[in-house]
Amino acid sequence: MSNFWESSHCRRWLVPRTALPAGRDALIETTRWMVVLGCKARMRQRVIATAIVLLRRFALASGSDWDEYAPRAVGVACLYVAAKAEECPMQAKHWVRYASHHAGYGTSLSWCSA
């Protein structure tokens, strides 16, 4: 049997909120935007959750350099990779279309009652 408490995920990726990079507000805003984009693209919740995990891991791995990256471009890349990983692929051109169409979209999730 596998033990979560001895896994690499638990040892390496579970960190306190204070350990997140300085651009935490951008990380939160990007996460909300990814949820909106994933709902608009009719992606499964598991794909969106995997994309958020990938985004957080990228932010932790990049450390203080998080501010140098375009958060929404990284978010779209995480959604694309998560869709591939969860075997729910969508072509990259469709993600780009959704992202450009909803670039200025607010973070209200009231319409997303899927």
Regions of interest found by a model, annotated:
Residues 1-17:
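An acidic, Gly/Ser/Thr/Pro-rich helix-cap/linker signature
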Residues 22-114:
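Structured all-alpha helical bundle cores of eukaryotic regulatory proteins
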